[in-house]
C-alpha cells in the first residue's frame, strides 16, 4: 500500500489491529471452524472461549476485510477466504505462520523509543528470537511443524527450480540448508539418475526424512545433520544448491568449493537486491525486521554475492530470475 492521503496514513497506522485479528483467527482455527458449520458470535465465542461481545467485534472486523460473510445471522468463510486460505495451505501451516508473526512483534514494542539502539530494539523484558539453529535444536516438535510448513509453502519454488535448473552432468546434489528437501524432491522426480543429500539441523533432518519416506524417495534422498558453518561435511558432489538460506560469505563459499567434484557447480537462489537501495517490498519488510535484532543488517546485492564468489575462486557462470522474483546465480570452481 502506498498512502496518498491523510486518511490512508491514519488507516495504515492502525493496520496492526487487522493483522492481529487475522493472526488470531489463523492460530485459533476460526476459518476452519466456520467452514464446518456457520455460527453466530455466541456460537464462535462458546467454541473458542472468547467473550461474546469481543467475538462479535472480531467477526465484524474480519467480515469488513472480506474474509467472512454473514448468512442468516451466522458467519461463514467468504469465497475469497476459501480460495486464499482454506484451499491454499493446511490449517497447521497457517497457524504456524501466524504464530511466527506474533512472536516477532515484540521487536516493534516502543520502537520510537528504542530505534536508536545500536544493537537489538527488542524490549528488555522480551527475549529476542534465537537463531535458526538454536530454535530448531531446542524444540523438536516446533522443528517438525516448521519443516512441514516450508515443505508446503515452497512447492511452487521447488517446481520453478526443477523446471529451470540445468542439471547436466549432475548425479550427486548437496541441498545445503534444504530443510524438508522440497527442492531436492522436485529435482529427484524430474531427474531419475539424481541422488541428493540435505544438510540441516538434526531435528529438521528427522522431519525431512519422514517426508522423503512419504514420497517413497528415502533411497535417493539422504539427510545429513550438521551445522554447515562449523561441522565437517560430506564431499564428492557435482552440485551444491543453497536456496533461501540467507548465509553467505567468502569463507563459506571456499568451504563449499572443497565439497565439489572437479568442475562442480554452486547454485545460489535467494531474493537478492538488484543493486544497493533497489529491493522488492517483501525483502524490505524482512530486512527492516532483521535490522531490529542486528543493527547493521544489510541486504546483499547480486554484485556482492558475485564478488564473494570470485574471492573464493569461483567463476560466475550465470544469473537469472525466477517467476517468483528470486535470483539464481550459478558458479563453478
Predicted segment positions?
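Alpha-helical subdomain
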Residues: 1-64, 69-70, 167, 172, ...
Amino acid at each position: 500500500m502506498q498512502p496518498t492521503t491523510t486518511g490512508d496514513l491514519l488507516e495504515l497506522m492502525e493496520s496492526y489491529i487487522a493483522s492481529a485479528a487475522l493472526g488470531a483467527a489463523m492460530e485459533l482455527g476460526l476459518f476452519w471452524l466456520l467452514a464446518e458449520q456457520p455460527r453466530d458470535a455466541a456460537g464462535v465465542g462458546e467454541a473458542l472461549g472468547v467473550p461474546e461481545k469481543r467475538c462479535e467485534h472480531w467477526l465484524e472486523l474480519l467480515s469488513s476485510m472480506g474474509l467472512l460473510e454473514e448468512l442468516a445471522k451466522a458467519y461463514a468463510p467468504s469465497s475469497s477466504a476459501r480460495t486464499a486460505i482454506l484451499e491454499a495451505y493446511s490449517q497447521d501451516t497457517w497457524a504456524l505462520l501466524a504464530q511466527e508473526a506474533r512472536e516477532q512483534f515484540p521487536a516493534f514494542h516502543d520502537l520510537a523509543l528504542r530505534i536508536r539502539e545500536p544493537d537489538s530494539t527488542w524490549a528488555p523484558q522480551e527475549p529476542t528470537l534465537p537463531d535458526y539453529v538454536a530454535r530448531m535444536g531446542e524444540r523438536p516438535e516446533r522443528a517438525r511443524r516448521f519443516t512441514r510448513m516450508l515443505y508446503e509453502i515452497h512447492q511452487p519454488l521447488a517446481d520453478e527450480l526443477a523446471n529451470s535448473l540445468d542439471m547436466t552432468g549432475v548425479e550427486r546434489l548437496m541441498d545445503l540448508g534444504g530443510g524438508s528437501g522440497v527442492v531436492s524432491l522436485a529435482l529427484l522426480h524430474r531427474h531419475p539418475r539424481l541422488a541428493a543429500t540435505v544438510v540441516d539441523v538434526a531435528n529438521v533432518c528427522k522431519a525431512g526424512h519422514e517426508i522423503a519416506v512419504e514420497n517413497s524417495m528415502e533411497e535417493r534422498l539422504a539427510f545429513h545433520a550438521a551445522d554447515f558453518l562449523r561441522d565437517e561435511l560430506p564431499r564428492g558432489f557435482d552440485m551444491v544448491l543453497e536456496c533461501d538460506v540467507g548465509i553467505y560469505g567468502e569463507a563459506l563459499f571456499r568451504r563449499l568449493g572443497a565439497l565439489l567434484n572437479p568442475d562442480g557447480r554452486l547454485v545460489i537462489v535467494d531474493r537478492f537486491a538488484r543493486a544497493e537501495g533497489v529491493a522488492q517490498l517483501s525483502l524490505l519488510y524482512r530486512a527492516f525486521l532483521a535490522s531490529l535484532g542486528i543493527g547493521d543488517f544489510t541486504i546483499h546485492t547480486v554484485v556482492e554475492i558475485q564478488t564473494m564468489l570470485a574471492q573464493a575462486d569461483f567463476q560466475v557462470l550465470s544469473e537469472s530470475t525466477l517467476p517468483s522474483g528470486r535470483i539464481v546465480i550459478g558458479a563453478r570452481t
